[in-house]
Structures are given as C-alpha cells and as structure tokens.
C-alpha cells in the first residue's frame, strides 16, 4: 500500500482481493473502494478474470456500491455477463467473448462454452438480490440472514433454496412505490430479517404457521 492509500498493483482484481479478505485498515478500505469504483468507471467495464470476478460484485455491494454492482450485472457490451446472452448463450462461457462481435469464434483450445468461473455471479444474486446469506455460526442453514438489497432496476425478484430443513423461499415485488417481501421459513430454523436502510418507511407484517405434518421432513 502506497502512502496515499493506493495499492502498488493498481488493478480491479488487486483491490477486489484486498477488500474481500480484509487486508486493509479502515482508512485504506475506504480509499480502495473508491479507487475500485473509479477504475471501473475509467474503463467502462470490469477487467477482472477468474480470480477477481467471483468477488467483484460482493465487494461492491458490501461496501455501499450496490448500484455499481447492478450496473455491471446489466451491462450487455463486451466484457460483461450479458454480452454472451446477446450472442445466444444459454450457459456461462470460459471467455467473455467466446463469440466475437463479428460472429467468429475464439481459438478452440481455450473457448469452452460451459465453464464455471464467471457463473459465480449467481451466488451474488442469491445473497444480495434475493437476500439469502449464510450465518457461519450455524452451518447448514439452521439460522441464516435474509437481507435483500432492493434496486430500482427490478420490479420482481423470486427465488428459493432447498436446505436440509426444507425450502427457504424469498420473493419481493415493487408496485406503485410499495415494496412487498414474502418469506417461507422452514420449521426448526431461524431467520434474521434485515430491511434495506435505503428504503425507510412503515412495514406491515403478517404470517402463517404450518403444522409439522404440512412441512417436508
């Protein structure tokens, strides 16, 4: 870390890894977050690869830059997650541009069209858009956190996870300025629900209990 708080390797991946693994002081963390955002804006896109991409949007959302993470998610120009979709992709590719803008292909020796790495964005979508977060003190989703980050680009988010205790289901919707959050909490589990501080207001709560024989397990 230099005297002005910047990393000696001034790349998106360097900042992402330093922030993800808490390698910086509080003062340097703020500088690193701002520098990461500036770097993304200067390039106009992400520049991370297999190491940095799985943590990029997590780092942005965890440090108050969720809007910037959403912007990366919804980008359709290369390099981005949705660029392959514009080329007809139904899987995650090994390269951001496995099919080039002119329709030609990259060299087949490194051009898998079913590759794991960039698919890590799915976990971020589960834990931030849907809002299901693991509590490391309670393995197996015995207790967990539900903290969806509502965003103006989405009117409906709906998802579920089949835990050992049953299905955890989360959905939220927006209509005429009102937000509605629906949860399904399996029996014998606990959920800590945290509402986005950027959407203050009054929340009306209603719930229904299911009898044990009505649940799976």
Language model features with spans:
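Active-site core of glycosidic bond-cleaving carbohydrate-active enzymes
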Residues: 1-182, 187-197
């Amino acid at each position: 870390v230099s005297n002005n708080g910047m990393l000696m390797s001034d790349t998106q991946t360097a900042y992402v890894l330093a922030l993800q693994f808490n390698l910086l002081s509080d003062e340097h963390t703020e500088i690193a977050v701002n520098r990461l955002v500036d770097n993304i804006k200067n390039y106009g896109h992400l520049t991370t690869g297999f190491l940095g991409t799985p943590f990029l949007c997590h780092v942005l959302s965890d440090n108050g830059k969720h809007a910037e993470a959403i912007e990366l998610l919804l980008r359709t120009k290369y390099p981005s997650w949705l660029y392959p979709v514009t080329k007809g992709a139904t899987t995650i590719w090994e390269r951001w541009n496995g099919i080039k803008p002119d329709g030609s292909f990259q060299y087949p020796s490194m051009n898998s069209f079913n590759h794991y790495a960039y698919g890590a964005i799915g976990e971020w979508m589960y834990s931030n858009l849907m809002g299901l977060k693991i509590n490391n003190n309670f393995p197996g989703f015995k207790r967990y956190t539900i903290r969806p980050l509502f965003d103006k680009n989405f009117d409906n988010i709906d998802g579920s996870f089949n835990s050992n205790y049953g299905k955890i289901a989360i959905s939220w919707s927006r209509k005429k300025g009102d937000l509605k959050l629906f949860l399904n909490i399996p029996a014998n589990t606990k959920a800590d629900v945290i509402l986005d501080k950027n959407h203050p207001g009054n929340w009306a709560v209603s719930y229904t209990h299911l009898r044990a024989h009505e649940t799976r397990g």
